[in-house]
Amino acid sequence: MKYVLICEDKKDSLEVRLSNRDKHLAYIGELGDRISMAGPMLSDDGERMVGSVLIIEADSAADIQAIANSDPYALAGLFEKVTIRPFRQVIPGA
């Protein structure tokens, strides 16, 4: 099943995000084709990264939570809130 992982950054934490970005991207890259989509959420003006959204194939929400917990961003204390929801892809057809 696919899950959407929404990670909201703590306020004024851009430096934490930027200093851990390379480690985060390497970690996410290790998930390979389990990742359908990933990228940063942006501020309302589109200028700053304020979180992350990923769509990931996994057996359970617990698996997604484990992925989120091991992310270098999470280990650095970047996230204020993490939300995991089952996701059904309709377009393009899955």
Report residues per predicted region.
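Conserved, structured core segments of small domains
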Residues: 1-94
